[in-house]
């Protein structure tokens, strides 16, 4: 596939993700898909995990759709996508209670495409920026243990 076709696969996924169309996962992701999250040492494998990760995030946050990229670059079988996401927590996330504060954070994904399917993804969200904006980080000099 061409780099433009690979970009189209990623854009289609993100547009459908923002609509909550999880059925598209079976069409766009390889059965043996591998997901790498920057903060987790072990990758997650399988299409069912794609859905679980995305549904959990969408369940925890009100997300304002952002499928317009800040950056979209492709070379060979790789596509790099950067987006700015606005979100407000509505349920607990990573052990933190919802603060109802809105956050705007950058997210960078690197996708590997093979034969029109997403086979691997590296996700690099600005988790520090997210937690800071939500007030879920300890204040320096604020005491504590």
Question: What are the roles of these predicted feature ranges?
Answer:
Residues 1-145:
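C-terminal and inter-domain tail/linker signature
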């Amino acid at each position: 596939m061409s780099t433009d076709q690979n970009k189209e696969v990623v854009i289609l996924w993100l547009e459908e993700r923002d609509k909550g169309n999880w059925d598209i996962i079976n069409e766009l992701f390889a059965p043996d898909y591998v997901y790498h999250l920057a903060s987790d040492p072990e990758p997650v494998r399988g299409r069912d995990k794609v859905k679980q990760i995305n549904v959990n995030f969408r369940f925890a946050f009100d997300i304002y759709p952002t499928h317009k990229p800040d950056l979209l670059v492709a070379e060979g079988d790789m596509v790099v996508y950067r987006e700015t996401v606005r979100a407000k927590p509505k349920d607990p996330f990573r052990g933190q209670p919802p603060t109802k504060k809105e956050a705007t954070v950058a997210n960078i994904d690197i996708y590997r495409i093979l034969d029109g399917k997403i086979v691997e993804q590296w996700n690099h969200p600005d988790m520090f920026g997210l937690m800071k904006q939500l007030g879920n980080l300890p204040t320096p000099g604020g005491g504590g243990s």
